[in-house]
């Protein structure tokens, strides 16, 4: 029995995309032990996925804690590392493992024993890149996020009386404020949807509080799921929604993975070929500055895409 370590940190969108290859890896190594190295904020996500024999936390802190993590990994006597993060930090880890062990390493870094070299000019999407990487190990890939396991907490659709509804995802992390379309614009979209007898459902969590409160102050006829929209609920809603509109943020990847048609509002800080969700159900409007995107332009896009 082999011991296999996956490494995955990053944003929620990265984590959601990585479930595609994590599922492929699990199907391939059916008789082996699989561990994952991740940050504390995604511990529960991977615990609920229920694929791993051990979850090891690496919050990427100071040198002393990092040494402790590396020692822990050495003690596990790992046979194969599959680096799904491919960062400068994990490249350092690979360098150390190459010096002091015979562990096989699959990744994009120069110290990988089974290295995937990608075209840096025409970079693949996250899912395609990771899929290409693990195919070097002989793993068959499906290239689709694996998320059906999320549906544990059931959403009560009686709350919306069988109305047609549309998901509104106005949030974004504070550090990515340049990817955030103004809340007042989302409020106008909500008003427009109401005029078409389509219920806007607003999703979001703590970081989105200010934006959601502003929307609610301008348009009250919405279903407000602020702090009531965990990933499983978003996934269920996405499967039945007419569509969704969103900034470039983690939940957009989840919505797109459900098959829901989603229209993204983007600035030049979003790479449409590599970072945003890919698929025929994903469309976008993009300008250098996101604040220059007009509500009227988005409404026209929604009419064309969703026949509202």
What are the roles of these predicted feature ranges?
Residues 1-308:
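Catalytic machinery of carbohydrate-active enzymes
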